Amino acid sequence: MAVSARDYWDLTKPKVVALIVFTALVGMFLAIPDMPTWLQVRTGALGFLGIWLAASAAAAINQLLDAKIDAQMARTSWRPLVVGKVRPWQVLVFAGVLIVISMTILVVWVNVITAVLTFASLIGYAVIYTVYLKRATSQNIVIGGLAGATPPMLGWAAVTGLPTSADWINASLLVLIIFIWTPPHFWALAIFRRADYAKAAIPMLPVTHGVPHTRKQILVYTVLLAIVTLAPVAVGMSGMFYLGGAAVLNAVFLWYAWRMLNPPDELFSMKMFGYSIVYLMALFAFLMVDHLLLPWVR
């Protein structure tokens, strides 16, 4: 049976990758203090493409290495490799082609530092997290979350090359936001899917330490997140428009985290999971709008 374009598309986890590359795009915009030059637009577009292809390759490799686990979980049992729509060698070739194209674009037309950081992130997620951390520790998503948090830095690097310490610091603050956001985001899902994780012998926190402990950890990380999101204002990267938007988003996220301690029903954790996605997209949208369209409110 021939492999369809949709099957290859599904291998890339398009919804997950869309959020990843959006934060990379915001990193690009924040890195440029004024209107971008034509060269910056061209470099940014190529950087965006390279980062997107690398993230897609990482997603495909993750599905290749996790096929046995995915087959045991209701949430992932439909994936193309699990149901036999694609063969493992086809996934490997597909991912390899994406990596080669991505690295060629980044090295030749963007810059080496972006290529190196992007490749390191790919290895961090597709290999270190998927092969080792996911199966080894209940802190898998905390430690492994660093690889998934780097896209804003990758975007920043694409248009600047990270030439100064200020560039590294500002880009790192954006990475820190996603890094702290990842545990409450993923643990909310893990609470709802804990039976699947237990069946697949994946030591997610709700499986190893119980749901009440996980709910408390979600609250702790959500409080930390609310604090960390003040950093762009503290360093002068963003202004009052972003601060106001972040305050509203954080208030709702904190309410969800507090309510999670005694949720009204089993589905509440999925509601928090859904909001966490909206939260991150909106937070980075506020960063971008504040930077591009509302300089007068700073």
From Swiss-Prot:
Species whose genome carries this gene: Xanthomonas axonopodis pv. citri (strain 306)
Protein name, entry field: Protoheme IX farnesyltransferase
CDD domains, A to Z: PT_UbiA_Cox10
Transmembrane regions: 16-36, 45-65, 93-113, 114-134, 141-161, 172-192, 218-238, 241-261, 277-297
Cell inner membrane among keywords: yes
One of the record's GO cellular component terms: plasma membrane
Gene from which this protein is expressed: cyoE
Swiss-Prot/TrEMBL keywords: Cell inner membrane, Cell membrane, Heme biosynthesis, Membrane, Transferase, Transmembrane, Transmembrane helix
Further remarks about this protein from its record: Carbon 2 of the heme B porphyrin ring is defined according to the Fischer nomenclature.
Reactions catalysed, as given in the entry: heme b + (2E,6E)-farnesyl diphosphate + H2O = Fe(II)-heme o + diphosphate
Free-text function comment from the UniProt entry: Converts heme B (protoheme IX) to heme O by substitution of the vinyl group on carbon 2 of heme B porphyrin ring with a hydroxyethyl farnesyl side group.
Family: Belongs to the UbiA prenyltransferase family. Protoheme IX farnesyltransferase subfamily.
Keyword Amino-acid biosynthesis among record annotations: no
Taxonomic lineage: Bacteria, Pseudomonadati, Pseudomonadota, Gammaproteobacteria, Lysobacterales
Classification via Gene3D superfamilies: UbiA prenyltransferase
EC numbers: 2.5.1.141
Pathway: Porphyrin-containing compound metabolism; heme O biosynthesis; heme O from protoheme: step 1/1
PANTHER family: 4-HYDROXYBENZOATE SOLANESYLTRANSFERASE, PROTOHEME IX FARNESYLTRANSFERASE, MITOCHONDRIAL
